[in-house]
């Protein structure tokens, strides 16, 4: 049985009805032995949960492919690794293997194509790295399921006054690394292309990274990442505190919107971002480019 999104989500459901696959799109009202989906044209559809073949959460408003491409461009500049190379519309990033974002190629131009993968594979081979592709929905027609399924969530930014309890620094110090469970070098964490980066810390308790970069359409985006809370300090509002501090910092630097990238199975992080006003924009997944060279698309 598939994993169901929370009630209230807008979803696309494929299910079995009289031995054939049927699709429905609408808002998920209830989850249980039966799920209920409110549609625009057919009212509320009740479906036995066991008959659901696949269910996918959708953004609440229509998102154009160009909007996805613009956001992904800003996000790639915000996590560029320590080395970058453009190849026929693909931005290749390398950062010593630390983090998927800093060590993957992302298609950022209309010209990006699967036919161009062999040079990408070779570029990563020369650096002794696996040739991962970060593939956002709708930018490339690829059938591979991939791994690390990720949702990209967004919200508009404003300068709503809040009490800031986090300290902001331009580098990740020992206090920031408290509770950060990854050994990512400073040169990878601080890397940004044509933008600014900052690190928010509630000393000894929590931290997060923020970066402001600009998309090709001129939109300045704040990317929030590496949000972490030290063990023993969960559910006390510290994650919210560092995120709110970063949102104010980003707004002060001209960012109009903010985004986060979060793994689909990280329910706690998704709940935090939803509480902060973030909603689904699109999905992405990681695919080993070598697997696409060996199979037909």
What are these model-derived regions, one by one?
Residues 127-136, 250-261:
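Conserved GNAT acetyl-CoA-binding A-motif
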Residues 1-8, 18-24, 29-30, 43-126, ...:
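N-terminal charged segments
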Residues 143-147, 274-283:
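Conserved acetyl-CoA-binding loop of GNAT-fold acetyltransferases
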Residues 161-226, 231:
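Flexible, substrate/cofactor-facing loop regions flanked by secondary structure
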Residues 133-139, 231, 260-270, 286-293:
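Conserved beta-strand-loop-alpha-helix junction that forms the acyl-donor binding cleft
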Residues 113-121, 226-231, 235-252, 257, ...:
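Conserved acetyl-CoA-binding loop-helix of GNAT-fold acetyltransferases
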Residues 78-81, 91, 98, 111-177, ...:
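Acyl-donor-binding surface of acyltransferase catalytic domains
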Residues 13, 34-40, 47:
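SH3/SH3-like beta-barrel fold
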């Amino acid at each position: 049985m598939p994993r169901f999104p929370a009630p209230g989500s807008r979803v696309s459901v494929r299910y079995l009805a009289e031995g054939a696959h049927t699709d429905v799109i609408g808002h998920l009202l209830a989850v249980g032995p039966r799920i209920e989906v409110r549609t625009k044209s057919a009212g509320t559809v009740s479906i036995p949960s066991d008959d659901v073949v696949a269910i996918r959460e959708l953004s609440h408003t229509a998102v154009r492919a160009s909007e996805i491409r613009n956001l992904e461009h800003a996000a790639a500049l915000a996590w560029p690794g320590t080395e970058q190379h453009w190849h026929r519309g693909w931005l290749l990033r390398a950062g010593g293997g630390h983090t998927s974002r800093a060590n993957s190629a992302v298609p950022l131009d209309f010209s990006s194509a699967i036919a161009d993968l062999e040079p990408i594979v070779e570029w990563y081979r020369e650096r002794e790295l696996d040739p991962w592709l970060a593939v956002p929905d709708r930018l490339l027609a690829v059938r591979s399921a991939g791994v690390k399924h990720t949702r990209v969530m967004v919200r508009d930014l404003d300068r709503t006054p809040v009490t800031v309890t986090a300290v902001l620094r331009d580098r990740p110090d020992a206090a920031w690394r408290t509770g950060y469970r990854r050994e990512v070098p400073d040169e990878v964490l601080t890397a940004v292309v044509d933008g600014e980066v900052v690190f928010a810390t509630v000393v000894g308790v929590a931290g997060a990274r923020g970066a402001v970069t600009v998309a090709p359409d001129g939109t300045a985006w704040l990317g929030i990442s590496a949000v972490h809370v030290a063990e023993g300090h969960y559910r006390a509002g510290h994650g919210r505190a560092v995120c709110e501090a970063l949102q104010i910092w980003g707004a002060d630097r001209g960012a109009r919107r903010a985004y986060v990238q979060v793994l689909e199975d990280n329910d706690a992080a998704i709940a935090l971002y939803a509480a902060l006003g973030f909603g689904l924009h699109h999905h992405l997944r990681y695919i080993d480019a070598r697997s696409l060279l060996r199979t037909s698309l």
